[in-house]
Amino acid sequence: DNTAKEKDSPANLSLRTCAAGDNAEQPLDPSRNTFDNAYYIALQRQAGVLFSDQSLFTSAR
């Protein structure tokens, strides 16, 4: 049955999973609506969420 195979194709699974497309928000910081220092503490512990943030924090420049 080709219908079942097409339904579970990688392209169709991607469309269902990523329905919002490029504009989908990812919950990288669950406390983003409140100001806290958890972001900076994580960087100090070498546990930054994004590699770019951690690199900027540890850069000597």
Curated annotation (Swiss-Prot):
Membrane-traversing stretches: none
Binding site for Ca(2+): D29, S31, D36
Main location: secreted
InterPro entries xrefs: Haem_peroxidase (IPR002016), Haem_peroxidase_sf (IPR010255)
Catalytic activity: 2 a phenolic donor + H2O2 = 2 a phenolic radical donor + 2 H2O
Enzyme Commission (EC) number: 1.11.1.7
Gene3D superfamilies, A to Z: Peroxidase, domain 2 (1.10.420.10)
Region (Disordered): 1-32
Gene Ontology terms: biological process: response to oxidative stress
Record flagged with keyword Iron: yes
Entry GO terms, CC: extracellular region
Gene Ontology molecular function: heme binding; lactoperoxidase activity; metal ion binding
Sites carrying sugar chains: N12
Compartments in which it is found: Secreted
Task of the protein: Removal of H(2)O(2), oxidation of toxic reductants, biosynthesis and degradation of lignin, suberization, auxin catabolism, response to environmental stresses such as wounding, pathogen attack and oxidative stress. These functions might be dependent on each isozyme/isoform in each plant tissue.
Family statement drawn from the similarity comment of this UniProt entry: Belongs to the peroxidase family. Classical plant (class III) peroxidase subfamily.
Protein name: Peroxidase 1
